[in-house]
Amino acid sequence: MKPTFLTRSLILLGTLAAFAFQTASADPAELRIGYQKSAVNLVVAREKRFLETRFPNTQVRYVEFPAGPQLLEALNAGSIDLGATGDIPPIFAQAAGADLLYVGTEPAKPLAEVILVSKDSPIHTLADLKGKKVAFQKGSSSHALLLRALNQAGLNYTDIQPVYLPPADARAAFDQGNVDAWAIWDPFYSAALLTGQVHVLTDGRNGLSNSGSFYLAARPFAERNPDLIPQIFNALNQAEALTRANPEGSIEIMTRQLGLPRAVVASYFSHRPDSPISSITAKDIENQQQTADLFYQNRLIPKPIRVADVATPTVPVTAQRQTNTEVTP
C-alpha cells in the first residue's frame, strides 16, 4: 500500500531524531535560512557564523522576511530551505496546502506580543475595541493574540474592523491615526513603546499567547537531508547559550545587524525569556491544534486541518526544554 502523507512524515521525523547526534554523510552545497528581525538565535548565529563553522563545505545564506506568512510562502515555493515563524503562519500555510513540516520550536514569548493603542486613546479595555479598526499582519501570531483577546472580552471577530497590513505599513497607519489599535510583536512593539506615545492594551499573558516560535522545513529538503536539521539546531543553540552568557554582546549584535537603535533591542531582550530550540512535543501539537480549530471556527481558514499530519513528537535535539519561570509582574 502506498504510504500516506502522515506515514511519510512520521518516518521522516523519527529519522531526524535517530540521527540527532550523528555527523552528516554529505552536507548540502547550499543552506538557505529564512528569518525575521525578532529571531535572535538566527541573527546571533549569522553574526558568529556558527552554521558556517559547523558546515564548512556549505554556502549558508540568510534571507530576511517582514513576517511569517511571507517567509512560509518562500519556503513552499522552494526559495528557502528552513525558517522560523510564529505559531499562526504554519496553520494558514497548511490550510492552503503548503508542503511543510514542523521540525523545531522555541518557548512562548508572551511579553513580546501586544495590542497597542495611542496613549490618548479612548480605548481602555478590550471590550472598547468593538467597532474599531485594528491593524495587524493577517495570518501572524498577532492575529491569534487579537482573536483570543476578543474572545476573552466576550467579543466576536466580526465585532471589529480588521485592517490587514504588514508591520511597517501597520506602524505608519497607526502613527497617522488611520487605525484605532495595532496588534504587533517585538521588535516592532519595542520601537513603538520607546516613542512614549502608546499604551499597551494587553500582552500575551493570561493564556493569550500559549505557543512559541516554530521552525519549519520544506518536506523535500528534510527528506533529502534527514540528519541535517538536528545539527542545524545544535549549532543555533550555541547562539542561545551565548546570549544567556553575554546578553549585552547579543544586544550589540542585533543592533549592528538589524540597524535598530540599541534601546529598542534592549527593550526586546527584556521581554524575551530563555529561548532554546527543541524538538516538537505532544503539547506543542495539542496547542497548535486548538489554535487551528479556533481559526476555523471563526472562518479564518478555509478548511479544518490536522496539525499532527505535519508534526510529531521527537527526541529532544539537545537538552530537555527549559521551563519558563518568568515572573508575571
Where are these regions (language model features)?
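Bacterial N-terminal signal peptides that target proteins for export
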Residues: 1-11
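Bacterial N-terminal signal peptides
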Residues: 9-20
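Boundary at the C-terminal end of the N-terminal hydrophobic targeting segment
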Residues: 20, 24-28
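Short, glycine-/small- and polar/acidic-enriched structural segments
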Residues: 27-153, 161-164, 180-184, 209
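Small-molecule pocket liners
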Residues: 41-42, 109-115, 198-199, 211-215, ...
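Pocket-lining segment of extracytoplasmic ligand-binding domains
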Residues: 88, 163, 168-256
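Secondary-structure end/capping motifs
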Residues: 223-300
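Conserved C-terminal helix/tail region of periplasmic/extracytoplasmic solute-binding proteins
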Residues: 293-329
